[in-house]
């Protein structure tokens, strides 16, 4: 059998060049998707075309205004365009009438897997060491002044004079940079400006200018009495949150970074006063041009900024991070992956982890994460993908589906307990502190018996269902009165989302304080 021929690098490059030259390809860029599509369809001689959406070439540009009608308060549910430019790669017909035999496809370098020892799974459900537990304590014992605060006083604890002064200073600086030397702003103007923004969340009109209209069907005396239309438009034009002269390289959110940091500080001003915490994603609606904009298929909000949120099971936010995509800085890359980095970063605000339990979904959960959190005395539970359990020998899904409803199987390696439960679908949950016992009952509808039946449900799954939805509750509260005032600034949705979240946080504190003082009230 003849041996394989070995090629030199120069010979390989020459061969690739010859194959590439056999296909005529024209590469052109267009500013919009519509123009790119028209160009691709107009070429009758092309064998095909690849349309590529390119990200912006500069992420820290000083210009932050977009070509939208900010007077229109009823935005489209779909973006008119995407970030950056659109590239069209047109493939010409092969001169020989044959497809090329190979293509040179570049792939990103894969993350190197960690060489960690495999756990030894067993049927004995016992941890090698229990995580200590403490009571989280009463919020009023830590902050007794809260019982005398009105809802307005609580909101002022989040949007306080210091934060509003920062907005005043940066807005005046931005106006001077735009050569407007006459623009002035004070904290009182900011208060009225924020009130009008909040008003648009529960009293929305089709167009912004209608708030100052004198027609009886749209007239709102409160708005026109406290601030004129031109003054509101002027403040919205120059409102700013950062100094353009002190930009941060490679930070896509430098215009709102300090604002988000200040809000997180205020969310944590009373400490972490809830026992049950959850971590999940949240979307802020945004249909403009920015490289941090995300698309989530199948979500109620498909286009927008993606937030990672640590919240209580009642919907109080403690820590918020905006996801900007994969970081180019190696220092920001976690050797364990994105989910591990997000969880550990959000939990940095938890000063006494033995007082809390954390829940998250299968995007984050892995055996390595639960083991790392256990070493930090953080009690955590989450749904999990079975390929992240390091060879845990749970029953295969197709076999478990044939078992009776409510059947479950569990394994433990001394650090993590993994359980798989047969419900409507097979569900896998992993925990570093929870247990299977006591096994409870869950009501389910039986199609064969035409009635509700009770099936066994492990304790860890019941606890997960009970405490996981905190971020979803927060998202529902915020969506109820989301501000509708729009702006041409790309960071405006994050700005108004912060205002909205601060109001929800103040309301959740107010509800919790009233429940402490008047326990007969029903929590909402």
Tell where the protein language model's regions lie, with residue ranges.
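Short linear clamp-binding motif
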Residues: 13
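Acidic, contiguous segments within the catalytic cores of piggyBac-derived transposases
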Residues: 2-9, 18, 22-50, 56, ...
């Amino acid at each position: 059998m003849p041996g394989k021929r070995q090629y030199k690098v120069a010979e390989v490059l020459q061969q690739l060049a010859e194959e590439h030259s056999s296909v005529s390809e024209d590469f052109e860029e267009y500013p919009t998707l519509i123009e790119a599509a028209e160009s691709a369809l107009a070429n009758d001689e092309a064998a095909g075309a690849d349309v590529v959406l390119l990200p912006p070439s500069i992420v820290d540009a000083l210009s932050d205004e977009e070509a939208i009608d900010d007077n229109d308060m009823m935005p489209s549910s779909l973006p008119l365009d995407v970030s950056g430019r659109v590239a069209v790669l047109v493939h010409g017909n092969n001169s020989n009438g044959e497809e090329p035999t190979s293509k040179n496809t570049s792939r990103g370098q894969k993350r190197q897997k960690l060489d960690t020892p495999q756990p030894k799974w067993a049927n004995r459900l016992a941890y090698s060491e229990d995580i200590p537990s403490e009571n989280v304590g009463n919020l009023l014992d830590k902050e007794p002044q809260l019982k005398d605060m009105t809802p307005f006083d609580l909101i002022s604890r989040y949007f306080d004079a210091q934060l509003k002064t920062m907005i005043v200073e940066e807005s005046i600086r931005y106006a001077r940079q735009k050569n407007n030397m006459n623009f002035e702003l004070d904290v009182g103007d900011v208060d009225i400006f924020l009130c009008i923004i909040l008003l648009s969340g529960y009293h929305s009109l089709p167009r912004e200018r209608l708030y100052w209209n004198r027609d009886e069907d749209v007239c709102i005396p409160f708005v026109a009495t406290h601030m004129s239309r031109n003054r509101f438009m002027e403040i919205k034009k120059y409102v700013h949150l950062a100094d353009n002269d002190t930009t941060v390289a490679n930070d896509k959110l430098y215009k709102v970074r300090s604002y988000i940091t200040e809000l997180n500080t205020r969310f944590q001003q009373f400490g972490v006063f809830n026992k049950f915490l959850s971590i999940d994603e949240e979307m802020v609606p945004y249909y403009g041009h920015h490289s941090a904009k995300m698309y989530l298929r199948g979500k109620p909000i498909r286009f927008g900024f993606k937030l990672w949120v640590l919240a209580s099971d009642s919907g109080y936010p403690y820590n918020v991070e905006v996801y900007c995509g994969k970081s180019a800085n190696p220092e920001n890359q976690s050797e364990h992956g994105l989910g591990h980095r997000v969880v550990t970063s959000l939990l940095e605000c938890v000063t006494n982890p033995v007082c809390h339990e954390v829940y998250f979904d299968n995007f984050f959960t892995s055996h390595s994460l639960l083991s790392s959190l256990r070493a930090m005395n953080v009690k955590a539970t989450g749904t999990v993908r079975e390929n992240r359990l390091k060879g845990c020998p749970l029953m295969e899904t197709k076999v478990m589906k044939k078992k009776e409803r409510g059947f479950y199987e569990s394994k433990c390696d001394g650090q993590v307990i993994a359980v798989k439960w047969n419900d409507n679908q097979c569900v896998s949950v992993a925990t570093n502190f929870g247990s299977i016992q006591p096994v409870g009952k869950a009501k389910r509808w039986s199609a064969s018996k035409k009635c509700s039946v009770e099936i066994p449900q492990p304790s860890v799954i019941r606890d997960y269902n009970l405490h996981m939805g905190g971020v979803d509750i927060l998202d529902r509260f915020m969506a109820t009165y989301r501000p509708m005032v729009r702006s041409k600034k790309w960071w405006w949705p994050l700005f108004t989302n912060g205002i909205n979240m601060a109001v929800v946080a103040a309301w959740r504190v107010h509800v919790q304080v009233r429940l402490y003082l008047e326990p007969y009230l029903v929590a909402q």
